[in-house]
């Protein structure tokens, strides 16, 4: 059957219109990014939630999925399994994973100070690190144990004989119930759980890894090294980082707003504004570059210090070889400055 020219033109116009709409939609479609957090929703990750809540990701043309972590989630495994584009991790566990064969590369360092500490009851008889010998010390595992193990090696304490290591759950019960002389805490979280449980600050002794000279870099952003060969990936991560750092600046300036963003994102309903605001106020102390152009920039000297700590762990160091400059890049951070 022969179609009339008019019908053919109309049909062609319709087809072109549909194609045009499809092309236009494709052109403006947001780029997808999935970030895997190290732990459950809390102010430790307020910058990501703030960036989402304030529309910074959307404004950057991104569709960002924020995956919470948890006790049964290993962020590096999620990243290696290609279920995320980028992850939040501590440098000790990231470098240990890299040495074990997962090619992690640091692309940004949000926290430039450590919030990790051991919190002890004075009545346990601990007043200095010299008193650790013979005591039970609570330690988080799942990658969080590396700074502790390095510290004990530096003190010359064997973890299988000189002290008793309690594999600590993610609560403060061992200290409250006197099952351990000291437990692992973060200045922005578990330490305050101890206080909220009724223990007075004057009855506690705290040892900050930062002050003990054994601190390592904590919350940073990591990707898989092969992906960095893709210019489009680097550009996409640059957009993500720029929006994320904007979210962190906003969170530091507005702890209450950050707390609201975190609570809104916590589907478990366990978060409270009071607790998350306090946590954000303490997290802010770990981001000394907030509000400056240096936020998120990994200082090579800080990287070198962390690697030195990880290598000088006595007979059982966290890593056995210096990963070198290949373990970090400023390419994504530089892309975020555009």
Residue ranges and their predicted role:
Residues 2-14:
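Bacterial N-terminal signal peptides that target proteins for export
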Residues 303-338:
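Conserved C-terminal helix/tail region of periplasmic/extracytoplasmic solute-binding proteins
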Residues 230-313:
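Secondary-structure end/capping motifs
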Residues 56-59, 155-159, 197-200, 268-270, ...:
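Short helix-capping segments at alpha-helix termini
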Residues 30-177, 181-188, 209, 215:
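Short, glycine-/small- and polar/acidic-enriched structural segments
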């Amino acid at each position: 059957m022969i179609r009339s020219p008019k019908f053919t033109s109309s049909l062609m116009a319709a087809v072109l219109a549909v194609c045009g709409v499809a092309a236009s939609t494709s052109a403006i479609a947001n780029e997808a990014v999935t970030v895997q957090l190290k732990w459950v929703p809390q102010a430790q990750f307020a910058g990501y939630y703030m960036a989402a809540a304030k529309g910074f990701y959307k404004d950057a043309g991104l569709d960002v999925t924020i995956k919470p972590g948890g006790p049964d989630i290993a962020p590096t495994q999620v990243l290696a399994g290609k279920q995320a584009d980028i992850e939040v991790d501590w440098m000790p566990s990231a470098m240990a994973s890299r040495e074990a064969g997962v090619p992690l590369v640091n692309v940004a360092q949000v926290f430039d100070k450590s919030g990790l500490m051991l919190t002890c009851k004075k009545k346990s008889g601990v007043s200095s690190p010299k008193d650790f010998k013979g005591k039970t010390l609570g330690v988080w595992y799942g990658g969080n144990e590396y700074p502790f193990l390095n510290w004990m090696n530096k003190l010359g304490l064997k973890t299988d004989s000189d002290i008793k290591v309690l594999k600590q759950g993610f609560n403060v019960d061992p200290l409250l119930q006197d099952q351990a002389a000291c437990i692992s805490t973060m200045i922005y979280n578990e330490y305050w759980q101890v206080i909220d449980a009724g223990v007075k600050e004057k009855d506690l002794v705290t040892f900050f890894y930062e002050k003990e000279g054994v601190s390592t870099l904590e919350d940073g952003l990591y990707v898989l090294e092969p992906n960095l060969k893709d210019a489009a990936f680097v550009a996409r991560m640059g957009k993500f980082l720029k929006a994320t750092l904007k979210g962190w600046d906003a969170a530091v300036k507005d702890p209450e707003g950050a707390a609201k963003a975190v609570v809104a994102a916590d589907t478990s309903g366990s978060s409270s504004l009071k607790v998350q605001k306090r946590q954000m106020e303490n997290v802010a102390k770990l981001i000394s570059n907030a509000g400056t152009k240096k936020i998120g920039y990994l200082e090579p000297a800080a990287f070198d210090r962390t690697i030195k700590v990880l290598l000088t762990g006595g007979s059982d160091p966290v890593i056995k070889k210096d990963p070198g400059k290949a373990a970090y890049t400023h390419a994504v951070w530089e892309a975020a400055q555009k």
